[in-house]
């Protein structure tokens, strides 16, 4: 009888830990952690007068919704920041539709939509929504430190360290 109870408790703990591991390591959870990290860095390192809006959601006239990770409002302009919490080597340039993430010593490759283009869409939408000239917006993509972006060809992409 006691063995059955012990077995059930151990099995329950094993299942609970497996579920927690999957939830905490889901792409959505990793993305949120990355966004929080970049928000903290922006708040601590940008000098002078600034306003930071994190996780802005708005709906366009056509009904499409947009989510922007960070907007940094400075006297020099409005910086629209897209955060990527990826690991491994990242390959791509501003003109390509898709970029490639390479992990596990080249054994695993994932394609993802070019974040510079993604953020350009955010800027167009925000500019239209605010009836503002696009020239005041700066496009910035930030990968967290575990990503190797040395293979990216873009002046808009940075690493948060």
Give the residues covered by each predicted segment.
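Surface-exposed interaction regions that form or flank ligand-binding interfaces
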Residues: 1-66, 73-78, 84-89, 98, ...
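Acidic/histidine-enriched active-site and ligand-binding environments that engage anionic O-linkages
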Residues: 91-93
């Amino acid at each position: 009888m006691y063995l059955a109870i012990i077995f059930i408790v151990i099995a329950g703990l094993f299942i609970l830990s497996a579920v927690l591991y999957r939830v905490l390591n889901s792409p959505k959870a990793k993305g949120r952690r990355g966004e929080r990290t970049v928000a903290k860095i922006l708040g601590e390192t940008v000098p002078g007068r600034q306003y930071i809006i994190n996780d802005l959601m708005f709906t366009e006239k056509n009904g499409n919704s947009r989510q922007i990770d960070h907007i940094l409002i400075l006297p020099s302009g409005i910086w629209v920041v897209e955060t990527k919490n990826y690991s491994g080597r990242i390959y791509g340039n501003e003109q390509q539709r898709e970029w490639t993430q390479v992990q596990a010593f080249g054994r695993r490759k994932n394609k993802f939509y070019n974040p510079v283009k993604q953020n350009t869409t955010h800027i167009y939408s925000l500019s239209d929504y605010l009836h503002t000239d696009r020239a005041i917006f700066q496009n910035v993509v930030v990968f967290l430190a575990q990503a190797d972006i040395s293979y990216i060809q873009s002046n808009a992409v940075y690493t948060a360290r």
